Design a protein with these regions (language model features):
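Class I S-adenosyl-L-methionine
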Residues: 1-64
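Short, well-ordered secondary-structure micro-motifs
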Residues: 20, 45, 73-75, 97-101, ...
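A charged, well-structured terminal subsegment
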Residues: 25, 95-111, 129, 180
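Short hydrophobic/aromatic-enriched beta-strand-loop microsegments
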Residues: 3-11, 61-62, 81-88, 133-139
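Short, hinge-like loop/turn segments at secondary-structure boundaries
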Residues: 2-4, 24-26, 51-53, 77-82, ...
């Protein structure tokens, strides 16, 4: 492990402030290693801002190969891997609907990260904007004891997690759009505007009641 070294926190709440000090130390001749407790820095984790500041300051940046959840999830999804886009976490509120509408017609495989508390909501929205028949693979707990991949249509995967409590962090892989799927997605979107809401499962009701009691929105 790392011993006798000075450690400091560098995260999304302080990275703009800490990056300047780190770059100054680098310019002074020190070596700095940026690591995360899981995944790879810069991939849905802090790192981009510090790397950019270091490069602009003329500091050499080297990268060691590291693990990132979306690659094994993509490979094991059974969906095309030759062309894909990594979207990470969708906007929680503002811009979420607009982004989903834009992506619904993308021809390449798409990759999303999601928390267990929002995964059912996201799958519902995929059904709404992408169409219920769009192929999806939802992978959780990658490389851990309880790793699981649920594959099927967006509707089938959604229904699975409406009845089975989602646990662990998720990677959701979605197939790209064909002309036929584009037509179906538009029809589903129009239908969803007048359709009755999806019946709430016991798990969803439990989570909603907990959130209302805590007085907070679902966040990571």
């Amino acid at each position: 492990g790392i011993t006798d070294k000075r450690l400091m926190a560098h995260h999304k709440f302080n990275e703009h402030g800490t990056s300047k000090g780190i770059v100054e130390r680098l310019k002074g001749g020190e070596n700095v290693c940026l690591i995360t407790d899981a995944g790879t820095p810069g991939i849905s984790d802090p790192g981009f801002y510090l790397v950019r500041e270091a490069i602009e300051a003329g500091v050499e940046v080297q990268t060691l190969p590291g693990a990132t959840a979306f690659v094994p999830a993509l490979v094991s999804s059974g969906l095309p891997c030759d062309k894909f886009c990594f979207e990470g976490f969708l906007p929680q509120k503002k811009g979420r609907q607009t982004r989903l509408e834009q992506l619904s017609r993308a021809p390449r495989t798409m990759i999303f990260y999601e928390s267990p508390r929002r995964v059912v909501k996201t799958l519902e929205q995929l059904c709404k904007y992408f169409g219920e028949e769009r192929r999806v693979s939802a992978c959780r707990e990658i490389s851990k004891v309880y790793e699981e991949s649920v594959r099927g249509t967006a509707k089938e995967v959604m229904e699975h997690f409406m009845e089975t409590e989602p646990k662990g962090e998720f990677v959701i892989i979605v197939s790209g759009c064909t002309e036929l799927q584009d037509y179906a997605a538009k029809a589903d979107t129009e239908s969803a505007k007048t359709a009755k809401p999806v019946r709430e499962s016991k798990y969803q009701r439990k989570m909603r009641e907990r959130e209302e009691q805590d007085g907070e929105t679902a966040t990571l």
